[in-house]
Regions:
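A structural detector for beta-sheet-dominated domains
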Residues: 14-16, 44, 96, 192-194, ...
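Short, aromatic/His-centered strand-loop micro-motif at the edge of beta-sheets
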Residues: 27-48
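Carbohydrate-binding surfaces in secreted/extracellular proteins
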Residues: 43-106
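Short intrinsically disordered, low-complexity coil segments enriched in acidic
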Residues: 1-5, 28, 90-93
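Secretory/extracellular carbohydrate-interaction modules
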Residues: 1-23, 38
Length: 220
């Protein structure tokens, strides 16, 4: 819910290191805000999306590329692709709409990246090292604490190792942004049923029942 972007829709792929923000390629989509980390993206209510993070392929990754098991096929390079500095790895974020939702054709124009089921590269983020550890998911909702409630469900979290082994995540530990850091006290994380199985549900403008540090399992 980013007011600087068309329809308040945006996707952010950025990160931090010890000395500040991580660098990366330019976004593969326009950015009305001019923020290198955030590009315009017309999310549609009720449409499931797959977020994939994997090494960029070929000469755009400093380390050996992981096997492409389960990774969307996208162009190796795009209009803004660039190789990372020595010692860094290019981590590519890709979003793929999985099905049509109840408002398909209303919130997105024909030909826009969220109207088709084609994978859409967001950008490459450059980080030191060549492994991903301690993954997390979160919902960055740029809305007032008393705004209309928003719900985001994260389901089917899966990691694929370099040998193609599939590891399905079953549990996560809850955390919230503190009020002192700009967060709200009325956000909540719970477990709900989604179309493809149990999911972690992130809710805003609601009563908080799950305390920080609580482990939430998707299946017992």
């Amino acid at each position: 819910w980013a007011a600087q972007h068309p329809g308040h829709g945006a996707v952010n792929w950025g990160g931090y290191c010890a000395v500040g923000e991580l660098d990366g390629s330019r976004g593969w989509l326009p950015s009305a805000s001019g923020n290198a980390n955030s590009v315009d993206y017309p999310w549609r209510v009720g449409v499931p999306y797959r977020l994939t993070v994997a090494r960029a392929t070929g000469d755009l990754a400093t380390g050996p590329s992981a096997p492409r098991h389960g990774v969307p096929e996208t162009r190796t390079s795009g209009p803004h692709a660039a190789a990372p500095p020595p010692g860094f790895t290019a981590w590519r974020a890709t979003i793929t709409p999985l099905a049509a939702g109840p408002d398909a054709g209303v919130s997105a124009n024909v030909g826009s990246p969220a109207h088709t089921a084609e994978p859409q590269v967001i950008r490459d983020l450059w980080a030191p090292g060549d492994r991903l550890v301690s993954p997390m998911v979160w919902s960055e909702v740029f809305a007032r604490c008393d705004a209309v409630p928003v719900r985001v469900a994260w389901s089917n979290p899966t990691a694929i190792d370099e040998r193609g082994g599939v590891h399905r995540v079953q549990s996560a530990r809850v955390n919230y942004q503190s009020v002192a850091d700009g967060g709200c006290s009325n956000t909540e994380v719970s477990v709900t049923a989604a179309a493809d199985g149990p999911a972690w549900l992130h809710s805003t403008s609601t009563e908080r029942r799950t305390r920080p540090g609580t482990p939430l399992r998707l299946a017992d």
